[in-house]
Amino acid sequence: FWRPSAIVCYSAGPFGGVRAAMHLRAVLGELGMPSIPSILPVPKVQDAFDDAGVPADAAWERRGKRFLDELEWYAQALAAARRGGTPY
């Protein structure tokens, strides 16, 4: 319990699977894995990466790093809080 989760979602359409991600956020919370506030949606995934998985736009590296930095921050914060005990 009390370990953070992060949601990456994708779709072939313009919304990047965010509707499914919102449902997953509720499920993860019930499992004791609160999700970080940010999600990383990948809209039009067929255009976002080439066949080798290389991002078509250099901005994906920046987005990914910021997303993982946030996950790491929450992991460290929740680890420190767990050392003090759980809320129940």
Regions found by a protein language model. Give the residues of each.
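Helix-loop-strand module that forms the ligand-binding subsite of alpha/beta enzymes
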Residues: F1-G32
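Glycine-rich phosphate/pyrophosphate-binding loop and the adjoining helix
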Residues: P34-Y88
